[in-house]
Curated annotation (Swiss-Prot):
GO molecular function: hercynylcysteine sulfoxide lyase activity (ergothioneine-forming)
Species annotation: Mycolicibacterium smegmatis (strain ATCC 700084 / mc(2)155)
Family in the record: Belongs to the class-V pyridoxal-phosphate-dependent aminotransferase family. EgtE subfamily.
Keyword Lyase: yes
NCBIfam families: egtE_PLP_lyase
Sequence positions bearing N6-(pyridoxal phosphate)lysine: 203
EC number: 4.4.-.-
GO biological process: ergothioneine biosynthesis from histidine via gamma-glutamyl-hercynylcysteine sulfoxide
Pathway: Amino-acid biosynthesis; ergothioneine biosynthesis
Gene: egtE
Function description: Probably catalyzes the conversion of hercynylcysteine sulfoxide to ergothioneine. Ergothioneine is a secreted antioxidant that protects mycobacterium from oxidative stress.
Name recorded for this polypeptide: Probable hercynylcysteine sulfoxide lyase
Species lineage: Bacteria, Bacillati, Actinomycetota, Actinomycetes, Mycobacteriales
Keyword NADP belongs to the record: no
Enzyme class, broadest EC rank: lyase
Amino acid sequence: MMLAQQWRDARPKVAGLHLDSGACSRQSFAVIDATTAHARHEAEVGGYVAAEAATPALDAGRAAVASLIGFAASDVVYTSGSNHAIDLLLSSWPGKRTLACLPGEYGPNLSAMAANGFQVRALPVDDDGRVLVDEASHELSAHPVALVHLTALASHRGIAQPAAELVEACHNAGIPVVIDAAQALGHLDCNVGADAVYSSSRKWLAGPRGVGVLAVRPELAERLQPRIPPSDWPIPMSVLEKLELGEHNAAARVGFSVAVGEHLAAGPTAVRERLAEVGRLSRQVLAEVDGWRVVEPVDQPTAITTLESTDGADPASVRSWLIAERGIVTTACELARAPFEMRTPVLRISPHVDVTVDELEQFAAALREAP
């Protein structure tokens, strides 16, 4: 439990019980201090001078992210979050705009796909929503698309996707793969050979809100056509420089760089193993709570556990009650989160490495008492 205690000791004391890292993890003292120090430096010397001074820290953040996903540091750009990243990528996509994704694709991602004129086709999946790689391979070979988009770990269901296997199958068919790693980065192994990967700071890496990353391999990047500035303008900027262009919160990016560094120092493999253990413990503790059904198989290697009500309880109302009456933070996932897969809303917990069995039992007891 050394990892769990170190993670907890590195942060402010929690007010209540935080089981919501899939929404927003708790930042460490070091992350908060780095973010604050940069903001103070902006006030002392000016925002642009401070940003120049922060270049080594920001470059270290790129390198740290790159090491987690198997890219070069020069392939990584900062964004304001995952939604921003997917829109940047899809709006720059050249040629035919067709893609295949999971039936349980994240609602905002589907919105970005539609807004950028993509025709979307569903990948074959099993009853748990896990992609069937062999079937997908046959379908994509017979009816290819311009790209495959895979959300490696959904926000409404804690099922780990076989990302590496799907990437290999797609590459055999000559199709590039984009990975949404918003829930996966810092949680699952994301070094899977994808052509592009994007993610958020605020979830399992426990960085500040309002920051994300997008990594694109050079072979794909050179084909992209960013909207701003127009490609025919005589401006000496690379594609990735164009993608990163725009106003941003430099202090938050510095804090994110520190957060990724902390994750590397803790050991990504150790963190993954502990989060898998957290998921198993959560499902075992919650399996006996009357009125709720645990959706995920107990051995899924993720820390996301979702609960379906079996007696008509409203997850959103239960979430509000848990916060107001017990100080327990969870997420209610409504149908819009995965509009083509979800049939009923769920209550989600996503504890980080520091959660204890006593805390999980405390949550289970509160759930039994919830109206």
